[in-house]
């Protein structure tokens, strides 16, 4: 099947922090290596959420997954020279506001105790301190400046409407409580760097990002991995990359036997992943039934793969392990004639290169 005759293939890359982006790069690099007529930078539409938004922009801007893979493996490569300080920068404005509000709440507490020592509404006073918490601990300002420099140096379009192939980045309007598609009207002229950080602004950790007078927070998988956006752009097939899934552990697990032994954050992470994965799978199933003309192909880590789970989403130092693990597992899947991923991609007109052989 020649390239012009191939069905339109869209890509939806979901978030998952730095480690999630590394997983997605590893998967896409393996697809480029193993498949005929597949280059991740030449697909028909790109949808990105969270750190997936950064990857979507890079691919749509002409960077191949193989190039990104090599660059991220090599710390000396200057393609995407991200450092910790680009992300780990305190949101001083919010912290100053929180400090002032905490002082005010403390004064009101002591005032209430002095005036009515026996009638103090403790929970009401505690609420004042909750209201004093910052909207986010870190700022995306440094990351935005870094992304803007990368976009400029690599010749990537500076606004979302300037791409040759459609790019849609997902965020949530904080005050409206709704999903927003950056790249569609009235946000088609949005700065690429600003749109990326709006999609990446994970609540609590990062302060909301202001865009056109509105506050935005990062998007996650949503109810259906945002495949509806790719379908509206005319894609007959949509690849969905979801790096974050619940882990399955037990006595035979090499790193973890019981999650409760690893503490509160591990338990919370597993709980969040269970809920998110359930919503995603149910949403994809509903969409598939309502739109049988659109074929959906979900790519995720194996449930027993502890590589993605045991590293913090912000752990840039784990990039080599995650990149190579995702690349290796995807390659093995594609070399297996019985694997559903291979069958799905062949249905989309992308054949495994014969020279790569089979692992059947």
Region locations from a protein language model:
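Patatin-like phospholipase
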Residues: 1-49, 57-360
């Amino acid at each position: 099947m020649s390239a012009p005759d191939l069905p339109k293939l869209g890509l939806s890359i979901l978030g998952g922090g730095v480690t999630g982006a590394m997983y997605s790069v590893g998967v896409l690099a393996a697809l480029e290596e193993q498949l005929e007529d597949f280059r991740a930078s030449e697909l028909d539409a790109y949808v990105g959420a969270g750190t997936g938004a950064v990857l979507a922009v890079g691919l749509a801007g002409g960077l191949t997954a193989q190039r990104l893979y090599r660059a991220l493996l090599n710390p000396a490569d200057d393609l995407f020279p991200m450092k910790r300080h680009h992300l780990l920068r305190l949101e001083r404005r919010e912290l100053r506001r929180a400090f002032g509000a905490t002082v005010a709440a403390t004064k009101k507490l002591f005032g209430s105790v002095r005036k009515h020592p026996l009638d103090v509404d403790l929970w009401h006073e505690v609420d004042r301190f909750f209201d004093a918490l910052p909207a986010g601990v870190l700022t995306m300002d440094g990351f935005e400046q870094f992304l803007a420099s990368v976009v400029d140096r690599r010749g990537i379009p500076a606004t979302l409407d300037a791409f040759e192939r459609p790019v849609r980045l997902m965020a949530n309007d904080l005050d409206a409580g709704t999903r927003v598609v950056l790249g569609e009207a009235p946000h088609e002229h949005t700065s690429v760097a600003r749109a990326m950080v709006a999609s990446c602004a994970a609540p609590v950790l990062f302060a909301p990002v202001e865009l056109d007078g509105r506050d935005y927070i990062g998007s996650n998988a949503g109810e259906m991995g945002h495949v509806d956006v790719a379908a509206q752009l005319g894609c007959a097939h949509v690849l969905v990359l979801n790096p974050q899934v619940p882990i399955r552990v037990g006595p035979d697990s090499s790193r973890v036997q019981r999650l409760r032994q690893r503490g509160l954050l591990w338990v919370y992470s597993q709980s969040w992943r269970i809920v998110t994965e359930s919503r995603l799978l149910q949403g994809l199933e509903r969409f598939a039934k309502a739109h049988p003309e659109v074929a959906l192909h979900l790519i995720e880590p194996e449930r027993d793969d502890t590589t993605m789970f045991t590293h913090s989403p912000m752990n840039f130092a784990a990039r080599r392990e995650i990149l190579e693990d995702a690349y290796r597992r995807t390659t093995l899947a594609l070399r297996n004639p019985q694997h559903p991923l291979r069958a799905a991609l062949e249905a989309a007109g992308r054949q495994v290169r014969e020279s790569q052989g089979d692992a059947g």
